[in-house]
Amino acid sequence: KREVWDAMADQMRFWMEKGVDGFRCDMACEVPLEFWQETISALRADYPGMYMLAEGEEPKLHSLSGFNSSYAWELHHLLNAIARGEKNIPELLEYIQKDAERHPADAFRLMFTSNHDENSWAGTEFERMGDAAKLMAVLTFTLPGGQPLIYTGQEMGWNKRFEFFEKDHIPAWEKNEYF
């Protein structure tokens, strides 16, 4: 355990020394909190501006571990349900209040309508949200406490599933309704 923790911390320090300004940590909630507490604290001593994004939703990733931002997965699923007509604005307002109460005031919540997992496995935001996709994207940019995620091609309105484990062609930028 200690050897693995040290090796992981060494790799993070290596990349910080190369000029990386932070990390997105996959499945951060599955890594012991003690590792994050120790490692983030040690790295921030030398790199106080280091930015840490947790793929996870637990408030303790912020309050105990030192992550700046975490994925708002619950919001993502709620936006999909609203787009399908299964949930409504009262549930969104309840989520906003609950999320603000659960997370520290300085925690950024990564808000998104798509990402590499959702696009590959569940479909594009247009497939999942239909005509509501644009409105849901606006919400991810404007809800309180949020930090929007723009996934590959969203800035262009691409309605394409990208392969998860294969090389995939990125379409050329074309003039369209998004710019």
What residues fall within each predicted segment?
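Short glycine/proline-rich turn/loop motifs
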Residues: 1, 18-20, 115-123, 166
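Active-site-proximal helices and loops of the catalytic beta/alpha 8
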Residues: 11, 21, 26-109, 139-142, ...
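Acidic/polar loop patches that form or flank catalytic/metal-binding clefts of enzymes
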Residues: 53-54, 145-152
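Active-site clefts of carbohydrate-active enzymes
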Residues: 103-128
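Alpha-helix N-cap and loop-to-helix initiation/capping positions
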Residues: 3, 30-31, 127-131
